[in-house]
Swiss-Prot record:
Record lineage: Eukaryota, Metazoa, Chordata, Craniata, Vertebrata
Domain of life per record: Eukaryota
Matches recorded under SMART domains: PWI
Span of domain PWI: 1-87
Post-translational modification note: Ubiquitinated. Undergoes 'Lys-63'-linked polyubiquitination by PRPF19 and deubiquitination by USP4. 'Lys-63'-linked ubiquitination increases the affinity for PRPF8 and may regulate the assembly of the U4/U6-U5 tri-snRNP complex.
Keywords: Isopeptide bond, mRNA processing, mRNA splicing, Nucleus, Phosphoprotein, Spliceosome, Ubl conjugation
Cellular component GO terms, alphabetical: nuclear speck; nucleus; spliceosomal complex; U4/U6 x U5 tri-snRNP complex
Presence of keyword Nucleus: yes
Gene: PRPF3
InterPro entries assigned to the protein according to its UniProt record, in alphabetical order: Pre-mRNA_splic_Prp3_dom (IPR013881), Prp3 (IPR027104), Prp3_C (IPR010541), PWI_dom (IPR002483), PWI_dom_sf (IPR036483)
Organism: Pongo abelii
Positions with biased composition (Basic and acidic residues): 73-107
CDD domains according to UniProt: Prp3_C (cd24162)
Name the UniProt record assigns to this protein: U4/U6 small nuclear ribonucleoprotein Prp3
One GO BP: spliceosomal tri-snRNP complex assembly
Keyword match Phosphoprotein: yes
Amino acid sequence: MALSKRELDELKPWIEKTVKRVLGFSEPTVVTAALNCVGKGMDKKKAADHLKPFLDDSTLRFVDKLFEAVEEGRSSRHSKSSSDRSRKRELKEVFGDDSEISKESSGVKKRRIPRFEEVEEEPEVIPGPPSESPGMLTKLQIKQMMEAATRQIEERKKQLSFISPPTPQPKTPSSSQPERLPIGNTIQPSQAATFMNDAIEKARKAAELQARIQAQLALKPGLIGNANMVGLANLHAMGIAPPKVELKDQTKPTPLILDEQGRTVDATGKEIELTHRMPTLKANIRAVKREQFRQQLKEKPSEDMESNTFFDPRVSIAPSQRQRRTFKFHDKGKFEKIAQRLRTKAQLEKLQAEISQAARKTGIHTSTRLALIAPKKELKEGDIPEIEWWDSYIIPNGFDLTEENPKREDYFGITNLVEHPAQLNPPVDNDTPVTLGVYLTKKEQKKLRRQTRREAQKELQEKVRLGLMPPPEPKVRISNLMRVLGTEAVQDPTKVEAHVRAQMAKRQKAHEEANAARKLTAEQRKVKKIKKLKEDISQGVHISVYRVRNLSNPAKKFKIEANAGQLYLTGVVVLHKDVNVVVVEGGPKAQKKFKRLMLHRIKWDEQTSNTKGDDDEESDEEAVKKTNKCVLVWEGTAKDRSFGEMKFKQCPTENMAREHFKKHGAEHYWDLALSESVLESTD
């Protein structure tokens, strides 16, 4: 006998499990073939022949189990038909399914629906996201739960049928059919009612649990969106109406119950421990998160780097762990020696400061420093030379000065005549008369321009009169069109206007071409600018010497170097402690601009990084005295330049600085600047 589609659907899960148990894996082809055999009503032999290509040796065993399952399903459906009406009534009381009871009461015979099968008319399901929430039962899960409950009932019935023998009943037409069923499928009415009550109770508990879950999810609508509505719709689809849970009850906190001793207990009187939430620091929270992250990294499986194309096994990966530091023990007395050295240094500095202070008060310090500035002499201080330097020119070498009355002829250059030294031309000829330019007024300039233009026009007229050049075309404009052309303008005004406009465009083009021809090129403009900045120094070079107390700021160094280069000035900057000498050479205009830069534009009193620490240690008076500033030491002229392009020279000692100037023949610049610095420090 062929089975219906509904019976095949109920049998399909069992066939899938049996195929997986027989073959060791699931095979949809075998399941489909087995369902076709049962659906077409084949006997065991035909079914075995049909399934033999798929199962081989296990065909007969699988076919026997398949037909036993079919017979058991039929017998269970016949045995449940007698208690169908009472079961529906109980389901109505539990789940409130009025639609099915109304259909039964109409008297029209409908198709019988198994106890846990889905109803045909499903309520409208609210669409949700494709992925279900983990805490929500889906339609498939509820169905599987119902099937598991049904299997438990069937197994329980089998166990009870083996334990207790069936009670004899009189043979009646109504009971003749159950007698033909197998013994394992017979059940007493009282046992059926007990099983039914158990199933109803389980279904009620599942519905209540699902309702609680949906109520909790309803309190947090942003958590899973509309997915919580899918579970409620699935409950209605299964024929279960979950009880409504009031949201206001869920939002209220659990009541606190205390016993006589003040301990927290639950409803049964058992002592419970409440969770105490204590405030903590963000640092502790970050530490916990950091530890969790490290744990996840440890649990994360390492990637297979060898499969990477760029993997090089020769390169070793450095471990990320920090290397442990070993102990370093100090020798005994090490810090005592360091402290003693520091104390000795402090005492020495204090003694030097006292000596320097006493020298400043007596003036010895100033005279000593000024004496050191002068160049070294071959003779010692206090020695009397044999011949003074002014006598060395007239006394010959090897002259014996021990004679009492030397002769006049023995001396060189002594005559009765007055010797006049040869006159030398000055390096700069300042006797040239300076002619002042004549500056005309605006009225005189216009008059001179008119006269020049009139003379040029007169020459052109003479050339035209002599026939040396054709007469120029009349200068026609839109304003004098009718006056110049006359009848021609009246006959064809459009043609005349076009002719006039063409002449105007021609004159404009000639004017622009003349301007472009007079315009200097980029190279010519560059040469003109350089010529303007480079002044004529053939009559003498103007020199300025500046002294700066502190020139450690790189920004100020850059300003000096950049402006000297832009003004085409030469010179040198010698860097020494408290005496920084800047020498610049160039024309008078460039010197004027550079002087304004050094004395006004640069703010020298701004505190620099090097003077910051010194000012903290010194007193207020010394700090005022040592305020950074720039002083013009000397300015004048010389015949030639002594230095090249502007450069910086670091000189730790005074001798080194003087030697650098002496190499260029300008050591007197350093002596002058240093002497002024010494005199200023003693004031």
